[in-house]
Every structure is written in structure tokens, then in C-alpha cells.
Amino acid sequence: MHPKKGMIHQVTKAQRGWGRVRHIALRCNARGQIRMSIKKLFPILLLGLAVLTGVDGAAIAAVGQPEPWQLGLQDPVSPVAVEGQKFFNLLTWLMTIITVIVLALLLYVLFRFSAKRNPVPSKTTHHTLLEVVWTVVPVLILLVIAIPSFRLLYFADRVEDADLTLKIIGKQWYWTYEYPDNGNFTFDSLMIDQETAVAEGLNRLLDVDNPVVLPVDQNIRLIMTSDDVIHNWAMPSLFIKLDAVPGRLNETWTRIPGEYAGTTFYGQCSELCGVNHAYMPIAVKAVTMEEYEAWVAKAQEEFASADLPSAVSVASAE
């Protein structure tokens, strides 16, 4: 063999060998990058799981009002709220499991079917078994969600053997409350201005001048409507969020257990209703039956004739 040809052959062989080494190195580097990406992604997944499933942790909001950095819902108080939180936890676990499975499949597909691993991609157009699976499984998941969802919906909608009725009327931008079972007195509830709230140590944008007062251990019917535009009476601790619609009556119910006597629960209007929508807080104070009866006696004197026209002056008969 000519020396020059032999040298060329050796160089070509060396180049091929180097090409194989470079190809293997690139593949290893790609694998390493994927592994590093997964390792970097793993703490994020753990953090997401902690956030999603941490609804029973120590960062839960205090009873009746939101707290800074809270996770999950406020502590449930009413029977509807307890069932609602169970449903919320079920949905959280389902969403977490589905998200993890989809993400794992996505990472697997990115690695297993990359261009380097599959220079000639598959031309498969359909897969009967796979199509049946990804049709049936979502249907089953929806059924798992629908059954407790409808149970909760009808449980919140039923009003049986109500001990007390509270009428709620939304107005721009305050609430009016009526107590038809206790003399039919009426009063308005407006937000305390921010300067006064800060000066007196009250909850800014949450405390009101006349809170709703409700007795504990009583089934309470809530009837809502509006005097102008659509409002929404939302009370997270009681799991109530119901529209107040002009010309229509919406109804729900609640029950506050006895251990919450003395607690004030806060909520807000949750339907955009105009320029001062953010200044329509709701405050509900739970009291014992004895305290409620004493408050009713006082409220009847204070509010019973508040909306009646002034008496007409007449001339003396003498």
C-alpha cells in the first residue's frame, strides 16, 4: 500500500472514531442535561405538591377572616362549609395526580422520542386501545367529580325547618338586612372608613358599622336580592357565595355551631358592581340565643321605625 494512502486511511479511521466518541458524548450530555433538568424540576414539583396539598397545614387562615400568606380555604364553620372543604380536598388530590402523570408522560416523550433517538419518526395514525383509554378515563374522572359535586349543590340549596330568616338586599355600595321573624326591623350596614378603622384597631376594609347578628345552633334561611345591580354575598367561612339579583330571590341556609359564639366572620361583595365594589364588606357576629334575644330587643327600638316617614303635625283641638 502506498504510504500516503495508508496515512489517509488512518486519518479517516481516526476521524470516524472521534465522530463516534463525539456522538456518544453528545448523547450522554443530552441525557445528563435531561437528568439535570429533572433534578432541578423535582424540588419545584415538591413545592407545588406542598402548596396544593397543604390545605390542612399550619398556614391555614384563622376562623372568620383571611390571614397573610394563608394557604387553602378558611377554616370551615357551617355544615355546608365542612362538606365543601372535603370536596375541595378531593379536587386538589385529583388535580395533583393528573398533573404529575401528564408531566411525567411529557418528560418521557421528550426523552424517548427525540429527533436523535428517532431520526425516522413513526407514521402511526391511530391506536384504538389508546383512544378508548383516553376517552373512558376522563369520563370516569368526571363522574367521580360530578357525584359529590351535585350532592354538595343540593345540600347547600335545601332549607328545611328554618328557625330564623334573614333577608339580604344588595345596594350600591352597602347591604341592607331585614329580620322578618323578629318584628321585621331593617338596618343598613356600611364599611367603617379606613382612618377610623386604623385608629380603633379594627379590620381595615372588613369591619362595618352595623354587623349582622345571628344566633348559634340555629338553622338560618338566607334570602337575597338586589335593589340596583347584581351583587354577590360571599362569606368564605360559611361557604356562602350567592348572587343578589334585581327582581329575583335567591335562597340558601347556614348553621353556626355553638363553639363559635362571640366570633365575627367577614366576607365581601364578590360581583363587580361599580366604582365602589371593593368597599362592600360583610360582617356576621355569632352570639348565644340569650345574647341574640337581648340584641333583638335593642335593635327593634333602634331600627324598627328608621325607615318610616315622619309623623304629620296637626293643629291642637283647643
Show which residues each predicted segment covers.
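Non-transmembrane, membrane-proximal soluble domains of secreted or membrane proteins
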Residues: 62-90, 111-318
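N-terminal secretory/membrane targeting signals
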Residues: 2, 6-16, 21-62
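Hydrophobic alpha-helical transmembrane segments of multi-pass integral membrane proteins
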Residues: 46, 50, 92-108, 135-148
